[in-house]
């Protein structure tokens, strides 16, 4: 058979290839790969949801076989492969793929190990409440356009009347021709709050929206490192977001064998294959690319994920974990590309543009829904008006109908005789006799009045944009109240990332570090001021073999410096330390700082500014003291910095901040104290890698316990003594309370292990030269008591006292009686029989108090 010449079209091959490929590309972009910015769905997902809705698979109905759904979609709306449709259905049911799943699956729908789902003939599904409430509701109310399906036998919606910004909530990914999209999922409650904020303030900026929507919220939880990638994605539509799994370091106890550290992974980054990750780690260990791993096993169960990476005895857990972050998908990047269809055209969207497109779409759908409801109400009211006319002229209507030859003539006479429309005349002719009763007439009148009110309301909505916006807000709030869930993904500060501290309140905080190395941060407001000699509140869940070792009061914007017994200093921002409740144990400090097992934190210091006029005074266990400029510690590396050079057997124990004009007071267990200046003559400044000089001479069996700094303003009024002068007897009643009017302060506060304490006027501690014995600071009530803390305090100070069992009491310094050096003190905290005072810390003044003091000084 030969082709007719009329059927052959001569064309240039290059033009034909170009045109055909362009048509194919646009078909893929619009009809397959990219989601619509309005409802956040690709055509296949939209067709699945609509087909399930048409099948009646609502949340209150039984499950149906997925094969039935797939067949419905293929036969009516989506003439492609059944595997593609089933895969799309499965993904919408996976809680590890969708932040808010749209389909409720029954059966095996796959796993994070990339296990395939069961065949569609075995699995069942139905719609979730979120789908019916927020995507498919009002679809019959002419809210969206419908078009013919592929063969013209059915109608399908071009978009679903979404009540939420579904594209932001569940995200999307797809590869088209020449372009791709990769939109991360977000928290439903946060996105709704952002949409409401935009409606209330259309001029809101992307930066302000980021305060409401801080970042993606992945279904698998995990962490996001830093905000720079989020900021770039939200402002430009493209950005790289670093995700990191949640891992902790635990000690594994093996009966009969030494304990070992293990890395426990409980959450993985979004779209990470758990089985492939474990295989990857095993390959790296076998290839000697990661050292220190002895065993790896998957202990995940129905209660959650748990990957156990057991380490060798000599392995440093933090180093191994950092290698895992670097070489495995435990840390990976999400390449955000916020591309979606807007009016059928691919467009890269910012966070504000996303919400604006949704807002405009909601205005359109509510306007169309209101017009539909108005039309239906007017049509119904039109019928009721005809019925009311008939009831008002009941006898005449009955006579007319009885006298009419047939229905058509009765209809014509009704239209002409009572000025009715044909629709009204039909309604009268179809009216049942029972509706002629007085009760039915009252019902018709009441319905007419109600419809008149509704019609006026619908007309008001169409006339006023603010009414439409109020309805959008109300519907968003309703969905949030029902479907919002807490955020799963935690956004943490990335190492070296600069953040705006204006976004973090500079609140007072307490930092607690236990002997076993657990650290936590608590708001100072957790502990209200209590009376002296009360028991206090539990501040930590302390195990029997653990106790509180360090206790620091600071502000959240401060840098917290951790000094170890080896003379190394580490640094953290106070707000980086996880905040915890009073009774929480905290987190292992090895998760936050690269501290070797045989190294111990011995001192915590908070710093607000690193300047040249301030110094660190460091004191070692053997009594060596050193002064080094604070500016030398302004750039502390991640793995720490040498703070002092130590001889074998010595340890760095105490570190304080001081000015060159200040003085130093050092106390010992047996109640002795030495007071000397910190100036260049007595204690010259040294570099970091130096040892220091001798501070205090100790008697046999005594040891240093504390050091504090006395401000220069007070030092000028203190007498200077010599080492040869005897420790004078102050005479009189040694436990007598001193008059505060005669001793305005500051005082030296001493607290003993047994819970006794007192305030001693600083003037009773004469200035001496270093390396002396010092003078008596306190007399003990019992021989087994000893001094545990010495602090310089003022009358308006507050202090926190913590015990070995984690009990904390907060009290005012004024509640502790001022006494002489030779007094035994008063009870400052009631202790249990097996408890003892562990540490004492002063509470810094709040920001409000500081501002008040500044304003008073300016006024004076």
Curated annotation (Swiss-Prot):
Name of the molecule in the record: DNA gyrase subunit A
Major location (coarse): cytoplasm
Family of the protein in this entry: Belongs to the type II topoisomerase GyrA/ParC subunit family.
Top-level taxon of origin: Bacteria
Entry function: A type II topoisomerase that negatively supercoils closed circular double-stranded (ds) DNA in an ATP-dependent manner to modulate DNA topology and maintain chromosomes in an underwound state. Negative supercoiling favors strand separation, and DNA replication, transcription, recombination and repair, all of which involve strand separation. Also able to catalyze the interconversion of other topological isomers of dsDNA rings, including catenanes and knotted rings. Type II topoisomerases break and join 2 DNA strands simultaneously in an ATP-dependent manner.
A GO MF term: ATP binding
Gene that specifies this protein: gyrA
Subunit structure: Heterotetramer, composed of two GyrA and two GyrB chains. In the heterotetramer, GyrA contains the active site tyrosine that forms a transient covalent intermediate with DNA, while GyrB binds cofactors and catalyzes ATP hydrolysis.
UniProt-annotated location(s): Cytoplasm
Catalysed reactions, as listed in the record: ATP-dependent breakage, passage and rejoining of double-stranded DNA
Annotated source species: Synechocystis sp. (strain ATCC 27184 / PCC 6803 / Kazusa)
Keyword annotations of the record: ATP-binding, Cytoplasm, DNA-binding, Isomerase, Nucleotide-binding, Topoisomerase
Note: Few gyrases are as efficient as E.coli at forming negative supercoils. Not all organisms have 2 type II topoisomerases; in organisms with a single type II topoisomerase this enzyme also has to decatenate newly replicated chromosomes.
Location of the motif GyrA-box: 530-536
SUPFAM superfamilies, alphabetized: GyrA/ParC C-terminal domain-like, Type II DNA topoisomerase
EC number: 5.6.2.2
Active-site residues, Swiss-Prot/TrEMBL: 122
UniProt enzyme class: isomerase
